[in-house]
Amino acid sequence: MSSYRCPVCEYVYDESKGAPREGFPAGTPWDAVPDDWCCPDCGVREKLDFEPMPATAGSES
């Protein structure tokens, strides 16, 4: 699974964890998150501004 980071506040959306408080349960793929979804921490960035994070050693893809 992949992770995506907000370039302003460093919030990370991790597909394996989802964002339950935003209505996205664990396992929700990034493609299923609406394009107009904003960062839940800073609220100023839309999904298209999030940056994919490189896979780390030991992570499952």
Swiss-Prot record:
The name this protein goes by in its record: Rubredoxin 3
Biological role: Involved in the hydrocarbon hydroxylating system, which transfers electrons from NADH to rubredoxin reductase and then through rubredoxin to alkane 1 monooxygenase.
Family stated for the protein in its record: Belongs to the rubredoxin family.
Species annotation: Rhodococcus erythropolis (Arthrobacter picolinophilus)
Family annotation (CDD domains): rubredoxin (cd00730)
UniProt gene name: rubA3
PROSITE patterns assigned: RUBREDOXIN (PS00202), RUBREDOXIN_LIKE (PS50903)
Binding residues for Fe cation: 6, 9, 39, 42
Keywords noted in UniProt: Electron transport, Iron, Metal-binding, Transport
Cofactor note: Binds 1 Fe(3+) ion per subunit.
Location of the Rubredoxin-like domain: 1-53
SUPFAM superfamilies given in the database record: Rubredoxin-like (SSF57802)
